[in-house]
Structures are given as C-alpha cells and as structure tokens.
Design a protein with these regions (language model features):
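Lipid interaction determinants
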Residues: 2, 7, 19-77, 81-127
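Sec-dependent N-terminal signal peptides
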Residues: 7-14
Length: 127
C-alpha cells in the first residue's frame, strides 16, 4: 500500500513539473514582425475590451486610421512608430502610448499596453 501511495505521489509530482513547463505564455512579436504582419497598408480588425470593432489601417509611412465597424466608436487618425519592444501610437494630438503584440490564437493577437509592469490588453487584432 505504501508503495502505491509513493508511486501515485511521484506521478502527481512529475505531472506537475512537466505540466508547469509544458504550458508557456506566448512571447510578444518582434517589432519587425509587427511591421510585416500589420503595418502594410492592408486593413484588419481591432476589437476593444468593450466589444467595439474597428477597421484599422497602418501604412508603411507611419500613418494610421481607425474606423468603427458599428455605430459605436469614433473615426480617428494618427501616427505609429516601432520601438525596442513593439510599437507606439499617437492618435490626433494625444500623447504616445506603447504596446506589444502577443499571438493569442489562430489569426488573433492581443495588443498589450507596456507602460506598466502588468500587461493590460487594450485590443484584440484579427485578420
């Protein structure tokens, strides 16, 4: 009986070790990969945490637009640039905010604010 308890305990321990290492969070995309995936002038969809959907267009020359797909949300334009970890945007005359892009499923990416040590998802991009 003690042998079976030991074997069961060992099995649980091994499962925990391999399970902890087998599941890892996706790494943020490298800035050049963000550029070639999204900043090409081709439209893609962004969904805010509240569910508002926008058609986004980031052009290679550093300009961007967003247009609401539904009636909620406002159309706006701004500029973008790559940084060491991801990219930064400035909408209209607002101050710049910086983000990373993390793959989150097939043809889906989480856009996360990088201003703090805790990642905050501000949109989900899809193609």
């Amino acid at each position: 009986m003690a042998s079976r308890v030991f074997q069961f305990s060992l099995l649980i321990f091994v499962a925990m070790i391999f399970g902890a290492h087998g599941v890892s969070a996706a790494e943020p995309m490298a800035p050049p990969d963000i550029r070639t995936t999204f900043f090409t002038g081709q439209p893609f969809t962004a969904t805010s945490p509240s569910g508002t959907k926008f058609t986004m267009i980031f052009t290679p020359d550093g300009k961007m637009t967003r247009e609401p797909i539904e009636q909620s949300g406002t159309k706006s334009a701004g500029t973008w640039k790559l940084n060491a970890k991801g990219f930064c945007t400035a909408w209209g005359h607002a101050a710049a905010n910086c983000f990373t892009v993390v793959p989150s499923g097939e043809n889906k990416w989480s856009v996360q604010r990088t201003a703090t040590t805790i990642a905050t998802t501000v949109a989900v991009w899809s193609k």
